[in-house]
A protein has these predicted regions:
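Positively charged n-region of N-terminal signal peptides that target proteins for export
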Residues: 1-4
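Sec-dependent N-terminal signal peptides
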Residues: 6-11
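Membrane-proximal, proline-rich intrinsically disordered regions
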Residues: 19-71, 96, 348-352, 468, ...
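Phosphate/oxyanion-binding loops and surfaces in catalytic or ligand/nucleic-acid-binding neighborhoods
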Residues: 47, 51, 244, 399, ...
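Structured, solvent-exposed acidic/aromatic patches
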Residues: 70-408, 428-435, 595-599
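C-terminal structural cap/anchor segments
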Residues: 385-472
C-alpha cells in the first residue's frame, strides 16, 4: 500500500493550496512543495471532522432515519437504495482514513519527531485512533500493522485491531500525563487556525482521548464482553471524561466549498471524486424515524398537540404542510406520483434554522456530550443499575433537546405540555424502563452522527421482524427497535393523550432491495419474517484500490467465492458477516430462529 502514501501526499498538496485562508496555509504557489507540521495539522483536523461526516452520511440511510424519493435496487448510492454495494466505485471513508488522514498524519508525525513537536504527535495519534475505530467498525479487517510498508499489506483481523486500539488509548493517556510530552520546550505553539478544534489545548485533547476509550469499551456491550467489571470501567472512564469535558467541535466559517459545513445547504464535495455531498435537500424522513421513533401525528396539524410526540421533531426538520402534518416515507419505497419533495419536511431547516448541524456555518462534533452520557447509561443498564440508567437517559435526552433550543424552563402553554407529555409517555419511570427505551432515545440523539448505524448493528437490528431480542438476566426480553407508543392515527381534536399512542412500529428492511443479494432463502426465517442474517453488517473494502492491488488479502478474508464456471467472484455475503462486537451472546440475546447460525 505504498501507493496509499504517495498519492495522498499529492492530494494533500493540492488541498493545501486550494484553501489557504481557511486553513491558514500561506505559501507561494511558485515555490517548491515543502511540508511542515503547522501546514499539515490544519489539514489533519479538517479531515478528522470530514471522516465523521463520511460515516454519518452513509449511516443515516443505513439505519433508516432518512430515505429518498427513489426506489432503485442498484445505483451509485447503495446505502440509500437496494444495498448492492459490490458494484460501488469507492467508499469515501476508506480513502479518507488511509489517504487523507493516515498518510498526512504519518508525514506530520515524522516531521514533528524531528522537530520535537510532541504535542502535534499526540493530536495526530488521537485523531488516528478515532479514525481507525470508525474504519474498522465499518469494514472489519483492514491493513494496520503493515499499512504503508508495501503495495499489498496484510489485513489485520478485528481482534488484532482492537487489541492495538486499547493499547494505543492507554499509552496516549499516559503520555498526556507526561510533562516531557505536554510541556516539552520544543512543542509547537498551536493556535486556533492550526487546530480549529481545541487550539492545541492538551488537557482538552486528553479528555477527548478518554471519551474515545469509553467508546472503545462500549463495543464490548451488549455482546462481546458484557460483564459487571466492563460496565464499571466504562462508567469510571465516562465520569472522568465528563469532569473536564468540552465538546470537540470543528466550526466552519462558511464561504466557498470546504469552508462550509458538510451538512449545510452548500453541500460541499471535498476532493470531488472521492467524496459524497449531502443530499438532505432531496431526502425524506422515514416512517420508522419520524412516525415511529419521533412519534409524528398524521393528519391536520393541531397546535395543542404539535406535529409529533417528541418536541425535537419540528426542530430536527422543518414542517412544510399543516394540512397533512409531517409526511414520511418507507425506506426506498418510492415517492407517490402525486407528491414532490416540497411536500415533505425540510431537512435543512432553511427557514427556521432550528437544526444546528445543517447550517453552512455549523460544526461537526467528533463526539457529542449526549453520546458520552448515553455510553454511561448503557453501562449502567447492563451493570444492573436500572435506576441509574433511567436517570442518565433522561438527562442525556434533555441535553440533546437543549441542542435544538428546547429547555423546560423556557417553555409555556402548549409547548410545555408537549414537553411533559413526551416524558410521561416515552420515559415514564425506572420501573418500566428497558434497553429499547434507552437505545431509541440515543438513536434520536445520534442523528447525523457516525454512531447511529454502529449502535443499530451492535444490537443486530433487533426487532420482531428478525426475532432478535435483548434482556439482562432476570429481565423480560425486548425488541430494541420495535417502537411502542406510536400514535394510532386518531385525528379528533385533542387526540394526544397516552391512550392515543398505543400502536407499535417495527424496524424492517428497506423496500426494493437488490434481489440477488437480499431476497434469497437465507434471508428469511421460520419463526420470524427475516433471518438473523438478513441485514448489512459491514461494508466491502474499497473497490477502487483493494480489488486491484490487494486481491490476495481479500481472498484470505472471505471476499471471494467460486461460481459455477470455476471463476472467483466477489461474494456478497461478506456484507452480512458480523463484526467482532456483534457476535451472538446467549446470555443476553434470544432469537426466534435459534437453529439458524449467525454469520
Amino acid at each position: 500500500m505504498k501507493k496509499l502514501f504517495i498519492i495522498p501526499a499529492l492530494l494533500g498538496a493540492m488541498f493545501l493550496t486550494s484553501c489557504e485562508d481557511f486553513l491558514d496555509v500561506n505559501k507561494s504557489k511558485d515555490s517548491a512543495i515543502t511540508t511542515s507540521v503547522d501546514q499539515v495539522l490544519p489539514v489533519a483536523t479538517f479531515y478528522a471532522s470530514q471522516i465523521c461526516y463520511d460515516h454519518a452520511e452513509y449511516g443515516v440511510y443505513m439505519c433508516q432515519a432518512l430515505t429518498t424519493g427513489g426506489k432503485s435496487q442498484t445505483g451509485s448510492y447503495p446505502y440509500s437504495q437496494g444495498w448492492e454495494f459490490l458494484g460501488v466505485n469507492r467508499h469515501p471513508m476508506w480513502r479518507r482514513h488511509f489517504y487523507d488522514l493516515g498518510a498526512n498524519i504519518n508525514k506530520m508525525n515524522e516531521i514533528a519527531e524531528e522537530k520535537g513537536n510532541r504535542n502535534a504527535i499526540l493530536i495526530g495519534r488521537t485523531v488516528m485512533l478515532m479514525s481507525t475505530m470508525m474504519t474498522t467498525d465499518a469494514f472489519g479487517a483492514m491493513p494496520l500493522s503493515e499499512v504503508y510498508k508495501s503495495n499489498s499489506p496484510k489485513y489485520d483481523s478485528q481482534a488484532e485491531i482492537y487489541e492495538w486500539m486499547f493499547k494505543e488509548a492507554d499509552e496516549l493517556l499516559k503520555l498526556y500525563q507526561d510533562p516531557e510530552w505536554v510541556k516539552c520546550p520544543t512543542n509547537l505553539l498551536i493556535n486556533q487556525k492550526m487546530d480549529r478544534i481545541y487550539a492545541g489545548d492538551m488537557q482538552k485533547w486528553e479528555t477527548f482521548c478518554k471519551a474515545l476509550k469509553a467508546r472503545l469499551l462500549l463495543r464490548k456491550l451488549p455482546n462481546w464482553k458484557n460483564t459487571p467489571e466492563v460496565c464499571q470501567e466504562i462508567i469510571r472512564v465516562v465520569d472522568d471524561a465528563l469532569a473536564t469535558w468540552e465538546e470537540p467541535r470543528y466550526y466552519y466559517p462558511g464561504g466557498v466549498t470546504e469552508s462550509n459545513c458538510p451538512w449545510g445547504p452548500y453541500a460541499p464535495k471535498i476532493n470531488s471524486w472521492e467524496s459524497r455531498d449531502n443530499r438532505l435537500d432531496e431526502s425524506i424522513p422515514t416512517t420508522f424515524f419520524l412516525h415511529g421513533i419521533l412519534g409524528s401525528i398524521d393528519g391536520t396539524y393541531q397546535v395543542s398537540r404539535g406535529y409529533a410526540l417528541d418536541p425535537r421533531a419540528a426542530k430536527i426538520m422543518e414542517p412544510r404542510n399543516q394540512i397533512s402534518g409531517m409526511l414520511h416515507l418507507e425506506s426506498n419505497i418510492g415517492m407517490d406520483i402525486n407528491n414532490t419533495i416540497a411536500d415533505f419536511p425540510d431537512l435543512l431547516t432553511q427557514s427556521t434554522k432550528t437544526n444546528p448541524w445543517t447550517s453552512n456555518t455549523g460544526y461537526i462534533a467528533l463526539m457529542t456530550t449526549e453520546e458520552l452520557m448515553f455510553i454511561k447509561a448503557e453501562a449502567q443498564f447492563w451493570g444492573n443499575d436500572i435506576n441509574g440508567a433511567y436517570n442518565t437517559t433522561v438527562e442525556a435526552t434533555k441535553e440533546n433537546m437543549k441542542r435544538y433550543g428546547i429547555e423546560e424552563a423556557t417553555l409555556v402553554d402548549h409547548a410545555l405540555n408537549q414537553y411533559k407529555r413526551f416524558f410521561e409517555i416515552k420515559l415514564p419511570g425506572a420501573g418500566q424502563f428497558t434497553i429499547a427505551d434507552l437505545m431509541q432515545q440515543k438513536y434520536v440523539a445520534m442523528y447525523l452522527q457516525p454512531e447511529q448505524w454502529t449502535d443499530m448493528r451492535r444490537y443486530n437490528y433487533s426487532s420482531s421482524q428478525n426475532g432478535i431480542s435483548y434482556a439482562a438476566p432476570g429481565q423480560t426480553p425486548v425488541y430494541v427497535y420495535d417502537v411502542k407508543n406510536v400514535h394510532n392515527g386518531t385525528n379528533a381534536l385533542f387526540a394526544k393523550d397516552a391512550a392515543n399512542f398505543n400502536k407499535t412500529y417495527s424496524l424492517h428492511r428497506p423496500f426494493n432491495l437488490y434481489e440477488a443479494y437480499w431476497c434469497t432463502p437465507e434471508d428469511y426465517g421460520v419463526n420470524a419474517t427475516l433471518s438473523p442474517n438478513a441485514w448489512v453488517n459491514r461494508l466491502n473494502a474499497d473497490t477502487e484500490t483493494e480489488t486491484k492491488y490487494n486481491k490476495k488479502e481479500l481472498e484470505k478474508n472471505g471476499y471471494y467465492t467460486t461460481n459455477a464456471a470455476g471463476e472467483k467472484i466477489l461474494d456478497y455475503r461478506i456484507l452480512k458477516k458480523r463484526l467482532i462486537w456483534a457476535q451472538k451472546n446467549p446470555a443476553v440475546v434470544q432469537c426466534a430462529d435459534d437453529n439458524i447460525e449467525w454469520m
